[in-house]
């Protein structure tokens, strides 16, 4: 699976992953909305939104 693995403020980068899914999680803090992308589908804390998907580059 090919997933994006960058944060909201950095240039888009991709990674070839062993997992079959990609994730995009997002939350708000003093900097605004933060978006983090990567491989797999991690558990998140309350207040953090997450979107998991199972196709290449699906987590943009």
Curated annotation (Swiss-Prot):
Keywords for the protein's UniProt record, in alphabetical order: Acetylcholine receptor inhibiting toxin, Disulfide bond, Ion channel impairing toxin, Neurotoxin, Postsynaptic neurotoxin, Secreted, Toxin
A GO term from the CC aspect: extracellular region
Keyword Aminoacyl-tRNA synthetase: no
Disulphide-bonded residues: 3-22, 17-39, 41-52, 53-58
GO molecular function list: acetylcholine receptor inhibitor activity; ion channel regulator activity; toxin activity
Annotated localization: Secreted
Stated family: Belongs to the three-finger toxin family. Short-chain subfamily. Type I alpha-neurotoxin sub-subfamily.
Function: Binds to muscle nicotinic acetylcholine receptor (nAChR) and inhibit acetylcholine from binding to the receptor, thereby impairing neuromuscular transmission.
Protein's name in the database: Short neurotoxin 1
Native source species: Dendroaspis polylepis polylepis (Black mamba)
Organism ancestry: Eukaryota, Metazoa, Chordata, Craniata, Vertebrata
């Amino acid at each position: 699976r090919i997933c994006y693995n960058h944060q909201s403020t950095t240039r888009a980068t991709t990674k070839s992953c062993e997992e079959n899914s990609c994730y995009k999680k997002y939350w708000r803090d003093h900097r605004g909305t933060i978006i983090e992308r990567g491989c797999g589908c991690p558990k998140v804390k309350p207040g953090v939104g997450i979107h998991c998907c199972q196709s290449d580059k699906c987590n943009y």
